[in-house]
Structures are given as structure tokens and as C-alpha cells.
Amino acid sequence: LPQFAGLPKEAAYGTVDIGGDFDYIERAFDDFKYGSWSKRPFLDCVIPTTVDPTMAPPGKHFMSVFVQYVPYKLAEGPWSQETKAQYTKDVLDTIEMHAPGFKNLVLHVQTRTPWDIENEVGMTEGNIFHGELTLDQLLFNRPFPGMGQYRGPFDNFYMCGSGTHPGGGVMGAPGANAAHEMLKDFKRGVVQ
């Protein structure tokens, strides 16, 4: 397992955010605004095999790294194998800065750009949140104004997932909220 500088070894058993302070995050976002990924990106690192070792061969682990602020369209042109390789290198270099020796532990890397995510699973512009997490698209405005109560545009149609409140990154909550609305409607005799 990687050893993150300044953190106890047990930190690898949870989520480790690499993002520093607000200035670090703002610089990462600025790169995104101008059509590039950040050379020092904001990262969410999770090693699920610390909780469920059956997900990898004995003695091995895998790490999932969510990179914030990666543009769908690059200012320099479309994503290519070369740009993807440089992006991957920048992410690995950033982790290495915070967990010295990390790159020596890596046996395989699989990188997904926003373009890959859109083409593989159909999420528009690779946005795993199914919409921006901005004030005009949060709370009762999620997924859009008038559809914020988990009910769809016709009877017996309910919505859940990242595109509904509270949005992406809150696992299970949108589904639980939609189920509560469905149960309320069922008790009132609305659901058939």
C-alpha cells in the first residue's frame, strides 16, 4: 500500500484527497477553465481492496483515482493517446509527490478521460454528476427546475441517481429519496 506523507498508514483504508488548500484547488480549476487538465490536479484516491481483499489477487491492491476538473474538450485539440499518456503521467507524478515510492508499486494503469466516459457509458461530456454541481443545478433545481422532487413528467415515473438531489458523490441517497417519494405516493394510492 502507498504511504501518504504526513498521514498514518491507516489513511489508505479510507479516501485520501490530494488537493492542498483553496489556492491549490483554484489553480487546478483555472487550468480546466482554459481547456487543460491541471499538472497538479485535485485527486480523490480510494483503495477498495483494503476493505474487500477479494477484489484483487492475494497481496495485491487497486486504487481508484477520481480527478477533478478535467475538460471534455482540450484547448490544444482532441484527446489522443499522447495527451492521455501525459495526463496519466501528471496524475501519477502528483500522487508520487504525496506518497513517495507510489509509482514503484504500480503494475497497471487504466485511464478514462471525459471523452472515454461519454463514449463508453453515455454520460454527456463524461460528467459523472449528470449535470454541474452549481447553485442553479442543486437542491430543488436538480436535475432542472420543476423536476426536483424525484417524480418524472408522467405518472409512476421516478428519478434517482447523480442527476437528482443531493447529486453525485452521495452514494445511495438519491435512490433512497426517490424510494421514499414512491412509498408516500403508494400509501396515498397514487402509484399503481
Where are these regions (language model features)?
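Amphipathic alpha-helix from the class-I
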Residues: V70-P78
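Solvent-exposed residues in well-ordered beta-strands and their adjoining turns
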Residues: L1-P2, Q68-V70
